[in-house]
Amino acid sequence: MVMDHDINGNGKFDDKELPGLKKGYFDNLKSYQYFTHLRLGTKKLEVPSPTKFVASIADGRVTFRFFVPLGLRLDAKTPLAVAFYDDTFFTDMVFNKSGPVALKVTDGGKGSVALRASPSLSYYSGQVVPTYAFITWSPS
């Protein structure tokens, strides 16, 4: 990926290099819902088309950052659960330890995030247990 798209060899993806990388790698992930798993309470949600795609290189790793516009209004009783994993085993993803999820509360109230393993959603014969970010909202 780096050899194909860091054309000038400067160790980062420049604005001219990003479109080819996005088209060649990221856009193809639509078939896999961008390895993004969303649940509102017990209901599985479809993943809308991401926006604000950016790719970076650090410590030999390529990182994709993107925004998933959900347009949901959360209530205090129903948590939103978000996870990123690949149950086809082509890639590995982890939440960033410093600031894994950014919340923007637009209607007042307070949002909170808790990372938890979800054994009921394990895969590969139960050997892999995904970590979900459980997002809750309260009116004050």
UniProtKB/Swiss-Prot annotation:
InterPro entries in alphabetical order = DUF1007
Q: Which domain of life is it from?
A: Bacteria
Name-wise, this protein is Uncharacterized 15.5 kDa protein in trpE 3'region
Native source organism of the sequence: Spirochaeta aurantia
